[in-house]
Every structure is written in structure tokens, then in C-alpha cells.
Regions:
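Acidic/His/Gly-enriched intrinsically disordered linker/tail segments
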Residues: 211, 215-223, 240, 244, ...
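Extracellular beta-strand-rich recognition modules
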Residues: 480-488, 552-559, 585, 647
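Terminal, low-complexity interaction segments
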Residues: 534-566
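Juxtacatalytic substrate-recognition/specificity segment
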Residues: 140-266, 270, 279-303
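Ser/Thr-rich, Proline-interspersed low-complexity disordered segments
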Residues: 17-20, 33-62
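Beta/coil-rich, acidic/histidine-enriched accessory regions frequently appended to metallopeptidases
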Residues: 24-35, 54, 60-62, 340-467, ...
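N-terminal Sec-pathway targeting helices
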Residues: 1-16
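Extracellular carbohydrate recognition and processing domains
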Residues: 506-547, 626-631
């Protein structure tokens, strides 16, 4: 998806500390959305209702030693793989058939003066329609041009106040904290653009489109300016939250230049943090998160209108990180070129930040664990402020389940890098046992078409994973068809996989397949590509007869844009009968090479974070270690100074969106 967006969340009844109003935030999938904010009744944990339906069964996951070694090898391979950043110019030339695409398009009409007019491409996010609007320049600042679509009503005093505050206050603050945008950039103009326009859709307050950073030869809907848009249908220039929207979208512009394929949850967390460090209203979405914290922090939703909790989670994590580790560490995290938790661990290592419990450099999982504990504890007196926020007071988290009568047991599951809070308050000394699963599937299917091994494309934003192999067809005179099995889940209308062929390594031809599509509503596609969902494993065929008599190199390219991505593509069971080639990938990679794509089994070692919070006269926290089979048994005493305990459970397996099963028994 090429749009970095701010969704509208209408607050129907949000009156906290005598403040009521509308809130906005975020990076969303394009679509028709108007979310209603639920009423906040109290800032305290909600009492869970015990479910009476059939609980989730904890699967039997017995593995042989060689299987354990294989899934551990999967993890090591994935940890070692660097997902390549896409190169829009290379893609436009290699797959789009363009030649000598320039990096920049200097604007011969710049600098502009107030009153001049200009035409811009904009996107209606309700229907993904791209269209043009005519706008007039209404403000020129030291750093910005502020354009307003012709016919849009506004007060000049509101414009002047907003534009001056943004130009003189927010822009310098963002640059000092998050870095510099591409400047003078694609248009060779030191000022960047803000466009206030209508028709952008009912679901957003504004968006930054990375397509605008490209030469129009590389993307048909590029404006070829550093810019972001504000939605005149949904936000007024006089309203407070538009200031936060501008800080938010400007951070996305900066981070596109600084670290283009950063994971969405991190990039979005930084944009929420931009509102925070500018002392602007970032509130609201944290409530969406804490009412159901079993949400994967490290993922981002594909469904329009369902990302409010993701904004809240990313915001809280980044504010906690800033409060806990300070401005130097947070700026180092922003500047780190590694993505996600890999970048976080790089910062911990570089700055020598130690976990006070272990005395060793913090791991990302340990920081995550401290954060989910802090969201419950929120007490600066516990372990020298390890489990609290200093610059913001979040709402209290909701309890996932509770045990008030012992013995009892719970069988459930939890998201990877999500969290369940289980309250136990039956008095007495009890034996508590925990049992987790042994492994997690990477992709949501049980097995590939044959054997155990297949290729997986991996996943990432603004990325280009590829897989290639050269076939000798010089002795072929008749039909040559490559067949293979594939499974895919790709962001609809925005991310595509292509298969292409070249006889010289320079000029490539995208090939048709049985299920590829030429539809291109976003302007992202270079030709017939796979998009959307396959609905399961399917057989594909690509005709190579036109290359008979030559050596031909085939390539699979998975090209993603910003913000949202599916789980990717899987490939298996290749056959090219014309030359007697066949590979089910069981013994080796079958001659395929590439970057980003990995050959693996559909399993990773399941790991967990387990902690116990003792609540009473004095709150304390204990991190619980698990045995090799993800189980443990220990005693807890409730009574006297301890009124209850809270079990904090998280899955911590990377690279998957599948949940982690577990069972808790108190006896």
C-alpha cells in the first residue's frame, strides 16, 4: 500500500479529565471506514466473563530430535536473511520496460508564490480511485508550501496559525528527533508540500504517499514532490487534532528517507511518538489496545478500520521505550537501519543497556516483557520505576481470564507478542503449572503439497524478494512449460508477485500464468502478477516455449509497498519436463537462488514469556523460566500481604502470525 494514512475515529462519548472530542491517528489500509469510539466508562481493568464454550485444545506436538533440529534451523535461516529494499527505478526499468528513469524531476517553476495554481494527483481511499485536483498556494513558509484545493472553504486566520506553528515549531522538532526528510528531494526544492483537498475518502484525516517521492516514469500517480495530504472533508484547519496529524505524517515522510523498509508497527509507533514529543494529543488509541491486549505488537492489520488497537499498542510501546531508556536510546532506535526487534537489540548492544535482572544486555523479548508488565503495574515504586510510564498515564489493561475457585484450569492461546493477563485470587498455597506448544506454523496451512520443504517469500514493507534460476533450453524445439505449486496471501491491489524471463540478464519479460492479473488500480503493478489470495495451494503453469533454443533465466519477484503486507507466497514442486527438470525441494533448493526467499519447513520453535505479578501490600514481579518442553511447575501463595497474583503470558516466536497455545492449571 502506497499510502501512509491517518484514520478518523469519531469519539462518540470520550470525556476523560473533562476533555471530549475527536481523535485521529495512523497508518491504515485504504478503504471505506468510519469507526465509532466506544464509551470509556472507567479507567480500571474489566472483569472477564469465564467462557462456557469448548476451550481451545492444546495440540499434541511431539517432535523427534531431527525435527527439532530442522525447525531450529528454520529460525536461524530466517534470522540471518536480510529482506532487500525495493528499488523503484530498477523495477520500472527491469519489469516495467522503462529506460533510463531519472531519480529526480527538478521543478522548473519553483520557488512558488502565494496565489499560483498547480495540479495534483490524489487518491480516494474509499474506492482506490486516483484523480487530479487543482489547488492554489495559500501559504509559503521557511520549510513548507501549503496548497488548498480550489473551492475548499477555510478561514485565512486558521490557515496562518496552523501553517506557522507547523513550519516553525513542529518541523524543527520532528527533524531534531527523527531526522531529515529527503531534501531538496525529488523536485530539487528545499520546501515540502502540504495539500488540503477533498474527496480523499471518509476514512482518513491525511496521508503520506511514498509514490510522490518517485519520478512519474517510475509511478504513474506520482506528484514528484515531498508532500502529504490533509482531508478537507473530515478535518478543519482550526481543530487541534490536525496539528497531530501533520506531525504524524511528516514523520512518515522523514522515515521513508531514513529507513524505507522499516516494519510498519515501528514506523507507525514513531509517527504516534511524533505527536507525543510535540505535546500534541495522541490519546484514544491506547484505550482501543488495552481493552483487548492480546494483539500482535509486531504485526499490522490488513482490514480497513481494525487498526486502532495497533496504533495504541505501537504508541504505548514507543512512549514506554522513551520513558524507560531515554531520548538518546530512542533517537538511536529511530536512526538504526535494522528493522523491528533486530534494530532494538542493536541499540541495546551499542549503548550497553543492561537488564537489571540478568546483568546482560537487554534482548528485545526482555524489553517487550517489561513493557507488558508495565501496562498492568504502572507503579513507579516497583523495581525503581521499571514498570511505569513517566510522560503519559495509559488506561488500565483488561484481564483476559480469572480463577477465583481452585483447583481450576484454563486452556487458551495468545498472539505472538500479544499478552494475556490471568488473575488468580483464590486464597491459599497452590501448585501452578504451565504448558505451552512446541512449535508454531509460519504460514496458515498444515503441510505443503509434498514432503516438508518449500520456498517462502518472507515478508516486509517497501521490499523486493526474488528467486532466480537459469535453464538451458538450447536443445528444446517444442513446448516448454514450467509448472509448480503455489500458495499466496498478498495485499490486494498493492503488492504483487511476478514471474519474468531474460536471455541476457538485462532485459526482462513478465510472463503470464494461469491466475495472474493485469488489474492495476493503485498504479503499483508492472504487468500480469499474482495478487490477493490463492485460497489454498494451486497449480500454476508458465509457458516458456518462446525461449526454446536459448538459455533463459527465470525470476520470481515479490514487490511490496509501504504499510501493509500479506504473509507472502509459498512455492513447491517445480517441473520443466522439456529438459527433465523436477524438484520437490526436499533435498536441496533445486537450483534456485535469490534474496529474501527461503527454503524451509512450515514450523518454528514456539517460545513464551511468562511472568507472575504479586499484587497486595507491595507489588512484586517474578519472571518464570520454562523447561525445554515449554512447561513449568511452581508454588504460589495468596493471602496476607498478597491479595492476588496475575499471570502474564505472551508468545514470542518471530516471523509468524499464528497464535501460541497454552494451558494453565492451579491445584
Amino acid at each position: 500500500m502506497n499510502k501512509t494514512l491517518k484514520i478518523i475515529l469519531i469519539v462518540l462519548s470520550l470525556c476523560v479529565v473533562a476533555a471530549c472530542g475527536l481523535t485521529f491517528a495512523g497508518l491504515i489500509h485504504l478503504g471505506n471506514l468510519l469507526e465509532a469510539r466506544p464509551e470509556i466508562i472507567a479507567a480500571s481493568p474489566t472483569e472477564p466473563a469465564r467462557q462456557t464454550d469448548t476451550p481451545i485444545a492444546l495440540p499434541t506436538q511431539s517432535l523427534e530430535p531431527e525435527e527439532l533440529n530442522a525447525i531450529q534451523a528454520n529460525l536461524e535461516v530466517l534470522l540471518a536473511v536480510a529482506v532487500p529494499i525495493n528499488d523503484p527505478i530498477d523495477l520500472a526499468e527491469r519489469l516495467g520496460g522503462k529506460e533510463n528513469v531519472p531519480l529526480t524531476l527538478p521543478d522548473p517553476d519553483a520557488p512558488y508564490q502565494v496565489g499560483e495554481e498547480k495540479t495534483f494527483w490524489v487518491t480516494n481511499t474509499d474506492n482506490n480511485e486516483n484523480f487530479q485536483v487543482q489547488a492554489t498556494l495559500r501559504y509559503v513558509g521557511e520549510n513548507i508550501y501549503f496548497w488548498i484545493e480550489n473551492g475548499v472553504r477555510y478561514k485565512d486566520s486558521d490557515l496562518q496559525q496552523l501553517a506557522e506553528d507547523f513550519d516553525q515549531e513542529i518541523v524543527p522538532t520532528n527533524r531534531e528527533f527523527f531526522g531529515m526528510e529527503w531534501n531538496p528531494g525529488v523536485d530539487d526544492d528545499p520546501r515540502f508540500y502540504v495539500l488540503y483537498a477533498r474527496g480523499l475518502g471518509a476514512s482518513l484525516a491525511g496521508y503520506f504517499s511514498s509514490a510522490d517521492e518517485l519520478h512519474p516514469a517510475a509511478h504513474p500517480y506520482s506528484n514528484a514532490h515531498e508532500m502529504f495530504l490533509l482531508n478537507a472533508d473530515t478535518v478543519r484547519l482550526s481543530e487541534d487534532y490536525i496539528y497531530g496529524t501533520m506531525a504524524h505524517e511528516f514523520q512518515h515522510m522523514i522515515h521513508w528517507y531514513q529507513d524505507r523498509n522499516e516494519e510498519t508497527w515501528v514506523n507507525e509507533g514513531f509517527s504516534m511518538l511524533a505527536e507525543h514529543v510535540n505535546d500534541l494529543n495522541s490519546g484514544g488509541f491506547d484505550f482501543d489496545y488495552v481493552i483487548n491486549p492480546d494483539l500482535q505488537l509486531t504485526d499490522w492489520g490488513a482490514e480497513t478500520g481494525e487498526n486502532g488497537p495497533h496504533y495504541g499498542a505501537s504508541y504505548l510501546f514507543m512512549v514506554y521505550f522513551l520513558d524507560r531508556f531515554g531520548e538518546e536510546a530512542t533517537k538511536a532506535l529511530v536512526a538504526n537501519s535494522e528493522n523491528g526487534f533486530t534494530g532494538l537489540e542493536g541499540v541495546m548492544q551499542a549503548l550497553g543497556i543492561l537488564n537489571p535482572t540478568t546483568g546482560q544486555v537487554y534482548t528485545a523479548n526482555e524489553v517487550f516483557t517489561d513493557w507488558v508488565i508495565a501496562n498492568y503495574v504502572q507503579d513507579p515504586t516497583v523495581e525503581q520505576g521499571r514498570y511505569t510510564y513517566r510522560s503519559y498515564t495509559p488506561y488500565a489493561v483488561s484481564i483476559s481470564d480469572s480463577i477465583s475457585s481452585c483447583p481450576d484450569q484454563i486452556t487458551s492461546d495468545v498472539s505472538q507478542f500479544g499478552v494475556d493477563y490471568i488473575e488468580i485470587d483464590c486464597p491459599g498455597t497452590h501448585t501452578l503449572s504451565f504448558k505451552g506448544g512446541a512449535f508454531a506454523n509460519i504460514l496458515p496451512f498444515e503441510a505443503p503439497p509434498s514432503g516438508d520443504y518449500f520456498f517462502w517469500s518472507n515478508l516486509g514493507d517497501e521490499s523486493n524478494m526474488f528467486l532466480t534460476q537459469t535453464f538451458d533450453l538450447t536443445q528444446v524445439t517444442g513446448e516448454a512449460v514450467l509448472s509448480f505449486k503455489t500458495w499466496y496471501d498478498l495485499e490486494e491491489d498493492y503488492d504483487y508477485v511476478y514471474v519474468s524471463a531474460s536471455t541476457d540478464g538485462k532485459h526482462w519479460q513478465i510472463l503470464d500464468s494461469l491466475t495472474c492479473t493485469t488489474e492495476n488500480p493503485s498504479g503499483n503493478s508492472y504487468g500480469c502478477g499474482w495478487n490477493g489470495s490463492s485460497g489454498g495451494w494451486i497449480e500454476e503453469r508458465v509457458n516458456l516455449s518462446g525461449f526454446a533454443g536459448t538459455e533463459v533465466t527465470l525470476g520470481f519477484d515479490y514487490v511490496t509497498d509501504a504499510a501493509v503486507n500479506g504473509i507472502g507466497m509459498a512455492l513447491d514442486d517445480f517441473r520443466l519436463d522439456a529438459i527433465g527438470y523436477a524438484s520437490d525441494l526436499e533435498q536441496d533448493a533445486g537450483g534456485w537462488k535469490g534474496a529474501g526467499f527461503v527454503r524451509l519447513m512450515n514450523a518454528l520453535p514456539q517460545t513464551y514469556s511468562l511472568s507472575v505479578i504479586s499484587v497486595g501490600r507491595q507489588t512484586s514481579v517474578q519472571n518464570i523460566s520454562l523447561d525445554a518442553d515449554n512447561s513449568t511447575v511452581f508454588e504460589v501463595t495468596i493471602g496476607g500481604d498478597v491479595e492476588k497474583i496475575v499471570l502474564v503470558v505472551s508468545g514470542t516466536t518471530p516471523f509468524t502470525r499464528e497464535k501460541a497455545p497454552y494451558q494453565v492449571e492451579v491445584r
